[in-house]
């Protein structure tokens, strides 16, 4: 009898432990990226990303619709608009990675939406939907005042770490880079390559997905202000980067604007400027992809040789890769 009681007690203990440990085991067993990751938003890559097609409920007064995540001129665009005949008055977009990411440096280049009652965001998240504890790290822009960025994080559903940073510019007027370095004992937040804040309490531990969304609030007027129903509103994103080893020392965060390389002789054509507008930017990248996919058979620029970025006498995917590396500042010039 004594042995049987002990056996029953041990079985009960193992069952309890399995309930406690299981969610954390699943987090560790998920696909966690541990190599550098760069996504330039020229098109929808369904192998790495997904468009949300559901509603979060709670304070989110919208339903996520894939139609509200679009791509144009080298940008991913989230659009908040009216929703007719549905359970929610508004529809908007959420874009999220399929893989999970852990400690490291995360960066986005984006332009926030401006309007009272809304939020534009860049964040990592995992939670009960992934069979994980709720861990999250946020960079959010409250549309009522886009001269500030709000930093926050959650560990096992516990937040309360909000910090409002004065940017010194309006995040809705132009593209800027925002990032954070997540480590076991701190989170450093960056704006345009400069570290602006460090958090050290209650740091999250569970790898999460990279996410971006745009949404109107409900029941949070004290925080966001009362949404006035204005539509459409858009937040725009150019790229996302992740470096597991932290901020790259030999590849600093991009500056707010992309400066095209200038030939020594101003009469020479500009390498990579395939649309002939005198600049090398995401528009050229989009045109280059259309050319390689045979959607177009010529570039708008007169001198087609500008597309031979690596000067090997061919126009192919190697040139496109080099152009991409230039746009994300992995190389200084073309």
Swiss-Prot record:
Is the keyword Signal in the record? yes
Active-site residues per Swiss-Prot or TrEMBL entry:
136, 140
Q: What is its EC number?
A: 3.2.1.73
Q: Which UniProt keywords apply?
A: Glycosidase, Hydrolase, Signal
Picking any one GO biological process from the record gives: polysaccharide catabolic process
Chain spans, region Disordered = 246-265
PANTHER family from the entry? XYLOGLUCAN ENDOTRANSGLUCOSYLASE/HYDROLASE PROTEIN 8-RELATED
Please state what the protein is called: Beta-glucanase
Q: Which organism is it from?
A: Acetivibrio thermocellus (Hungateiclostridium thermocellum)
Tell me the lineage of the source organism: Bacteria, Bacillati, Bacillota, Clostridia, Eubacteriales
